[in-house]
Amino acid sequence: MKKRIILAIVSSVSLLLAACGQEDSTSSQNSSQQEIVSTSQESSEGQSSSKEEKKEQTEAYYTSDTGSVTKVDAQTHEVVDTIAIDGSAHNVQISPDEKVIGVTIVPSEGHAEDSSDSNESMEMEHDEDSDTSMSNESMEMGQDEDSDTSMSNESDDEKGIAAFYDTETGEKLAEVEVGSHPAHIVFTNDGSYAAVSNNGENTVSVIDVSTYEVVETIPTGEGPHGFRIAEDGKTAYVANMGEDTVSVLDLESMEEINRITVGSTPATTGITSDGQTLLVTLNGENALAIVDLTTNKVEKVAVGNGPIQLFVQHDDQYVFVANEGTEENPSNTVSKVDLNSNEVVETIEVGSGAHGVVISEDDQYTFVTNAFDDTVSVIENETNEVIATVEVGETPNGITLK
């Protein structure tokens, strides 16, 4: 029985969230959640050995605008560590070697989690992605991060922070000054650099992780928010919420090399592993833009209300889009889009204000932060059902797995 409980990723994943004021779940809630997860795990025993051989996820990190990053054990649904942050934590990502957590921080009020608040480029409250920010991203967050609706270019010149923490000890390794209203943070696949989108000043800061120094600041379009870096580490695709475009950045020459018009209020991006297809959430028109990067042709797929972050499955078969809506008109769904047919094949009901989204490495589970009801939903991807709902801190946004 113990082996069966350990089998699935949900029982081995610990969630790290940025949230303060975390409320402890009652023992009865923990028990019922564990039973749900255990049942799901037992039913998955017949899955192929190739999936079982894939690396298991063990922890997840996500942030909240209440000023902390919190680690939660997914089996017990208990907080095991909380990192207090001086400011508003927006988005988070773990380094490729899983030793470092990067967090974007707005020193005072700023990026809240509400995609609604304006169209992310006005991301006042929006996302891993996020989130997610690109839940992508969205906006994490959630974000994922990410209240992903662009904080907009306020004339606030106060610089933001990218902070880095040891995943084992929670010790702060470095604090780097970046631009105004930092939104999302993404590591290159080799772990050499971390890039931060500065929503308030239309730039991306590139940080050398070996020295924790900004080595370049790259101009972008208006209101940069969620973004992803291609697998080869050479190109970043940044959603500009303020001007309906995506900036294409060359990370070798450290300059913008193209700008693609995609649609209203792009919140975050995703890219397939072959680097041929770009996915962009269009918060202003409730759609997902699918861009053929060989031609820059854009196809749009209608999704839910107020899409923020997205995450592409590792096998490139599906993309999951978190639909946050607004505080006045919240959404509580995730759209699952088939990338072969470019159609929504499932609409999954989660918590209110779906924001950050991330998928386990074996593609079996999707984790979604729900910004308006302070929970995380765990989706079993084969059945498209929510198998666990975890109570977390206030306004969770960006989310990333270890």
Give the role of each language-model region.
Residues 4-12, 16, 21-402:
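Predominantly soluble domains enriched in secretory-pathway, periplasmic, or organellar proteins
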